[in-house]
Amino acid sequence: MSQLNPKVGFVSLGCPKALVDSERILTQLRSEGYDIVPSYDSADVVVVNTCGFIDSAVTESLDAIGEAMNQNGKVIVTGCLGKRPEQIREAYPNVLAVSGPQDYQSVMEAVHEALPPKHDPFVDLVPDYGIKLTPRHYAYLKISEGCNHKCSFCIIPSMRGKLVSRPVDEVLREAERLVRGGVRELLVVSQDTSAYGVDVKYAEKMWRNKAYQTRLKALCEGLSELDAWVRMHYVYPYPHVDEVVPLMAENRILPYLDIPFQHASPRILRLMKRPGAVEKTLERVQNWRRIAPDITVRSTFIVGFPGETEAEFEELLSFLDEAQLDRVGAFAYSPVEGATANDLPDAVPEEVKQERLARFMEKQAQISAARLEAKIGTVQQCLVDAIEGDIAVARSKADAPEIDGLVHIQNADQVPLRVGEFVDVEITESDEHDLYGDALPAATRPAFDLKML
């Protein structure tokens, strides 16, 4: 082995099960090119796998941590005593990281942070953030699979199964790797983002030496620690969604909610098996805007659902007038094989569905145009997606890729810009979809953060 390999010291305490945990960690360390050394003074960092079963084991573990701190100073603690991180940090506040038993990934993340593995061009063919099909500067972050709802127009549960939430620490570590690899925007997706953690009873996990619940608000709080935009998609309108809006007001995550309301008629919503308290929905949208005045609310709707009357469609148009949503997508109802809505009576004729869809989109186009026009004269922080000659295409905080509008920067030949760069743009024009403006000179906007590249 080359003397240039990073060196890890290892102390394993406790029962045979803990010994197996140590073996797994050591195996991973060796597979990544770390040398395992027998003494504190020859180690670049020390891992202590602790026991906490009885008082004497706790004492032995704390003594081992203390010895490693005294003789080396760079110590990562894992194992059973790691389930009581406050006890460890009270005795040794300067340990690098603390994790519980079987949390191999946290140990490896802590080692990587303290002592990055040596780059091997013959082995490191895949970046640690994986292979992505999106541009380098944004990425989708999937937090769960499946869905527990039984919306009558949808067959997702039969295709993808019931809700299965990813552990919050796993999600946060993936997000951290993505940002470290140059991602500037994280787009949180799932079938039902609001239900995150319900299936695991909001289990608590450790990340960066702090406990996080597997829950939407806690996830947002963790993601807000990263130097990137965080955008929430597919948010089912549960009451606890209100908890994340203050984080938007504090600029910790983007003031943006993609929340599918689907309709505004209580009867149609019941037929869809969706929440039906439209008055409360309007109150909530108004309250979100009081808390976070810059919030963008995007939604999707279905027109021509079986049994929809002209009066109920008019209710939907009235809802658009009152809600003044920023971005809206709509679909004419189309039967999906296996959906229970197919069995509902009073199917709406195709020509009526298309006529209603056109009226719906015309109404929303007027609303969107007015809301965009109100931004003329403002300065919007934007993320540059593409540069073509003297025109750059970017997105503001209000614009998700592919589904929302764009910001056309018209002086890209006069101001140095790069794809994936944040830039402040003074808005000069608008239409019903997009904004147009000029990038401000670098001296008048925040410096580009090179650490993200």
Swiss-Prot record:
Catalytic activity: L-aspartate(89)-[ribosomal protein uS12]-hydrogen + (sulfur carrier)-SH + AH2 + 2 S-adenosyl-L-methionine = 3-methylsulfanyl-L-aspartate(89)-[ribosomal protein uS12]-hydrogen + (sulfur carrier)-H + 5'-deoxyadenosine + L-methionine + A + S-adenosyl-L-homocysteine + 2 H(+)
Keyword Cytoplasm: yes
Domain annotation TRAM: ranges: 373-441
Protein name: Ribosomal protein uS12 methylthiotransferase RimO
Residues binding [4Fe-4S] cluster 2: C147, C151, C154
Swiss-Prot/TrEMBL cofactor(s): [4Fe-4S] cluster
Summary of the function given for this chain in its UniProt record: Catalyzes the methylthiolation of an aspartic acid residue of ribosomal protein uS12.
InterPro entries: Elp3/MiaA/NifB-like_rSAM, Methylthiotransferase, Methylthiotransferase_CS, Methylthiotransferase_N, Methylthiotransferase_N_sf, NA-bd_OB-fold, Ribosomal_uS12_MeSTrfase_RimO, rSAM
Keyword Coiled coil in record: no
Species of the source: Stenotrophomonas maltophilia (strain K279a)
